């Protein structure tokens, strides 16, 4: 299995270094649900601003304040502790008057707004996230500038970030140990983390191998293509390759890579043979996903940061702003810009 740091680069390995997250204010994330609260219902959506505390910790504190069980507080996604983040929490408080959430106090956390909502906020139920990052001590401004220009046109690999695999790769190591035994894993969180790490690692490996091709965005027979921003896909046939290539070049269609699991992967013929060969050595992880009935799926191979802009504060400091759809990793963008340094260089979303 290829280590995250050794995955293939789309724009070549960065020539310079830089410091990511010298302080939490250098990494700002604003969650975009893609909808507004209903204004009525048994749930309360709470928009919070936090710094120095993780999402689960804040959710548990909110549950305690509202005198409800912690399982009654949900969120669309985890946000990093070592960053300044805005996100929504959802508390189920049926048949009660609206509590005064302005009285909720927690160090490093502030309630920005709250309103009633009809439905529970479920994991993954967000449109995306807006990022504002500050890279400091940049050693090669010209290289970073050119890479930002290139990313506007060609995007970046849609890799799962290193944080998906746990500190020191612990989640992936757990998956490998589990794959080598038939011992049931009772802990639901461990099951989820380990299976997710296994599937994400296989996806990254497939993308890394595809990026070694001369023309990364060349459609081949049997590729699974999806409309940009959509989840469904269709299979490319030889007769359609020229027209499909035009639509991929126009960013109307995206080439996808497999999230291996049980069932068909989605590709056929040449594309399927390539994907299977890319992860042929990872038989244990593939068998684990099939054994645990994790359904195969697809994910876009490349990621195009939206609304990408940047501003150099000086020759060694740049502020970068962009928006990414849900499930994408800001660190996969930064990775194409600089070789990061700092204690939290890999911890982002």
UniProtKB/Swiss-Prot annotation:
Catalytic activity: uridine(13) in tRNA = pseudouridine(13) in tRNA
Gene Ontology molecular function terms on file: RNA binding; tRNA pseudouridine(13) synthase activity
Positions of the catalytic residues: 80
Highest taxon of the lineage: Bacteria
Annotated substrate binding sites: 27, 129, 329
CDD domains: PseudoU_synth_EcTruD (cd02575)
Keyword Kinase: no
GO cellular component: cytosol
Pfam families xref list: TruD
TRUD domain: residues covered: 155-303
Keywords, alphabetical: Isomerase, tRNA processing
GO biological process, one term: tRNA pseudouridine synthesis
EC number, UniProt record: 5.4.99.27
The protein's role, per its UniProt record: Responsible for synthesis of pseudouridine from uracil-13 in transfer RNAs.
Assigned protein family: Belongs to the pseudouridine synthase TruD family.
Record protein name field: tRNA pseudouridine synthase D
Organism, as annotated: Shigella flexneri
The organism's taxonomic lineage, starting at the top: Bacteria, Pseudomonadati, Pseudomonadota, Gammaproteobacteria, Enterobacterales
